[in-house]
Amino acid sequence: MLLTVFCAPRDRSETTFALDVSPELELRDFLALCELESGIPAGEIQIIYAEQPLQDPTRALGNYGLKDGDVLVLRQAERLRAPPQPTVPGLPRIDFSSIAVPGTSSGQNRNRPQQAQRPSTTQPPPPQATTSPGSGVSPQGLDNPALLRDMLLANPHELSLLKERNPPLAEALLSGDLERFTKVLMEQQQDRARRDQERIKLLTADPFDLDAQAKIEEEIRQHNIEENMTIAMEEAPESFGQVVMLYINCKVNGHPVKAFVDSGAQMTIMSQACAERCNIMRLVDRRWAGIAKGVGTQKIIGRVHLAQVQIEGDFLPCSFSILEDQPMDMLLGLDMLKRHQCSIDLKKNVLLIGTTGTETRFLPEAELPECARLAYGPEGREEPRPDEIADRELAEAIQRSVQDSGKMHDM
């Protein structure tokens, strides 16, 4: 029979594997197979079926009611401490911690002689904090919000990833309020634990239940999405970046203009403000007024039937539709590009005018107009950009953390 095992280890991500076994196979032999597949020691493996743990290692799988196609949950139990060795009265106990191990002991331990101690009462080991599977708490400081906050503030790369992948937690971190950060962190850990519990219940539920099938389908779909994004980030990280648009330098009626080259636009357009700067508003034919429809809608004031555009040393005739509220000054549409047989050469990063053979380069980001830049400076803006606000908040949070640390040392 074919059994599907959902593995939930302590320190790794969940995995799923299938085993083709006989119903007469004993549980202890099945645990050995699971150890080979998962890498978890058999002594730490706990098998759960129908929300009940399988306890008897000598019992056959078929006697537990397992059938072909069933789903089992493999959980990694906590390591059990070895019981303390009983002391024999009258015999001394040797302190093996003082024995130097070559290559690992410090200079103090090398020179320290072995000492015999009198029999003493065995002290119980200190209790260790145990975490339930899926709680999201790991030894890396997640159970200490203050330590985690200091680690993130000291690592700009991790902080940028946190702002991208977990904005609520990043916002709480940059606020400088430790209580708020702890609250958001605990809520997310509890939510993750709840989702893990629901996933375990889902895997042990009746596979023929319609609600269970719908949840399984959604789980598979979400897993495929995450896997697809992970592969994309590893194999093609450039697809997550942004590219600057294609702009060229030109002149309209002797006035310099930065024109946006858009082969997807049907007509060449110009903003009303740019038309006023170029002194061609007097040529606008308002009988051609209307509405321009694309991603949104904008009002067309009218049309300039003929004007002269200078690109490098060429003077080209062109017509414009004047838009009332347009952020970019000028857009060269397909009507202009086809009329002059223009070619966009991305390898050379130039626009080739086919009728004259003239080439003009596309502008780098530093020369683009303000509205087209991905990262622009603060000149000419009254309000700061979001990344500037985030940088300022980060600096303030680091300063508050340093002050809090200083107060704690003084106390």
Swiss-Prot record:
Transmembrane segments: none annotated. Residues 1-81 form the Ubiquitin-like domain. Residues 108-121 have a biased composition (Low complexity). It comes from the Eukaryota. Residues 82-144 are annotated as: Disordered. Its EC number is 3.4.23.-. SUPFAM superfamilies: Acid proteases, Ubiquitin-like. GO terms for molecular function: aspartic-type endopeptidase activity; identical protein binding. One of its GO terms (cellular component) is cytosol. Aspartic protease that mediates the cleavage of NFE2L1/NRF1 at 'Leu-104', thereby promoting release of NFE2L1/NRF1 from the endoplasmic reticulum membrane. Ubiquitination of NFE2L1/NRF1 is a prerequisite for cleavage, suggesting that DDI2 specifically recognizes and binds ubiquitinated NFE2L1/NRF1. Seems to act as a proteasomal shuttle which links the proteasome and replication fork proteins like RTF2. Required for cellular survival following replication stress. PANTHER family: DNA DAMAGE INDUCIBLE 1 HOMOLOG 2, SODIUM-GLUCOSE COTRANSPORTER REGULATORY PROTEIN -RELATED. Belongs to the DDI1 family. This is Protein DDI1 homolog 2. It comes from Danio rerio (Zebrafish).
